[in-house]
Structures are given as structure tokens and as C-alpha cells.
Amino acid sequence: MKRFMQIWKPAVVGFLLLTLVCGVIYPGVVTIIAGAAFQDKANGSIIEGKLADGETGKYGSTEIGQTFTQPEYLIGRAASDGAATNLNPTSEEQKQLVEKRITWWHKLDPANNRVIPMDLVTASASGVDPDISEAAAAYQVDRISRERGISTKVVKEIIAENTSKRLLGFWGEPTVNVLQVNVALDSLKM
């Protein structure tokens, strides 16, 4: 029994010590630092404001794509709806999904005869991308303007205000945050 305790005591003490350090102390310290240094991001980048019913509430997170399908809103990338988003670009299933989405866009805005930007008919890898390209936002300006009864200039200004530029001026592409644009559009009528 003594030999058993000599072998197992260091293992159990080591296990408990590592559990305390790695499972409690380290995550606690990192959470406190993140909460203090990056308060908005550490709490999910939640947008709060006046909702349509006049109450103050939470719209959603700027980091997770929201589903908007009403014509008066800027509409984001196609949601994955729990399906695989890593389909082969040449697969028949992917082709059918894209054709279905193209048909949906034409029904939503029959007056728009421009080419639909690729990111509006394909899902992102995560399926919850909060941003779209500037081309995808520009494609929707006339419809939003018409549906809300506001000028295209106002819609373009709101989109420009909610566009992230290239990282370091050259890395990546500018993107438009769909939720931030829609919150700004809704704030116009309040």
C-alpha cells in the first residue's frame, strides 16, 4: 500500500495542480484581462439600441451574420442552414444551390438586371459571415432606397460609414458589415 501511495500521490497532486492552474487560474486571468482591455469584443461585440417597437434592446453581434430577407434591408451572404458549405465548386449540388439563390434574388428585386455578386449566392466557410463585399452592398442600394423611400445617396453614405478598409492598406478586401448598415438604416426612421 505504501508503494501504491508513493506512485499515485505525485500523479494525483500533479493532476489537481494542473487542473487548478490550467482550468481555473489561467482562464480566469485571461478573461479578466480581455474584459478590461477589450470590453466590447470580450462581450461578443453586441450592438444595442432602440428597436422597432421603441424599446432599447440588443440587435445582435457584429461578428455573427444575421439573417435578413426583407427587401428594405441589406441582405448578407447565404446562410448555410446547417448544411455543408464546403461543397466542391463544380459539384451538381453546389450548382443547384447557386441557381436557387440566383432565382431568389431575381424574385426579390426583379428591376435589378445587373450581375449578382458571387458572395450573395454562395455561403461562406463558416456559414455565418457578418460581412459582404462592397460590390454585394452596391448591388442592393437601389432596392433599399426604393423600399425605404430614401435617396440612394443616403444608402451609399451609410454603407460607406460601415465599410472596413483593407488591413494595413493592402491586405484583404474592404467589407461591409450587414448588421451595422441595417441598424443605421432603421435609426433613420426613429
UniProtKB/Swiss-Prot annotation:
Single GO cellular component term: plasma membrane
Q: Name one GO molecular function term.
A: ATP binding
Question: What sections of the protein cross the membrane?
Answer: 13-33
Q: What does this protein do?
A: Part of the high-affinity ATP-driven potassium transport (or Kdp) system, which catalyzes the hydrolysis of ATP coupled with the electrogenic transport of potassium into the cytoplasm. This subunit acts as a catalytic chaperone that increases the ATP-binding affinity of the ATP-hydrolyzing subunit KdpB by the formation of a transient KdpB/KdpC/ATP ternary complex.
What family, per the record?
Answer: Belongs to the KdpC family.
Q: Where in the cell is it found?
A: Cell membrane
Is Ion transport a UniProt keyword of this protein?
A: yes
Q: What is this protein called?
A: Potassium-transporting ATPase KdpC subunit
Q: Please, which domain of life does this record's source organism belong to?
A: Bacteria
Q: What keywords are assigned to this protein?
A: ATP-binding, Cell membrane, Ion transport, Membrane, Nucleotide-binding, Potassium, Potassium transport, Transmembrane, Transmembrane helix, Transport
Cross-referenced InterPro entries:
KdpC
Work out whether the entry's keyword set contains Repressor. no
The record's subunit annotation is:
The system is composed of three essential subunits: KdpA, KdpB and KdpC.
The UniProt entry lists membrane topology as:
Single-pass membrane protein
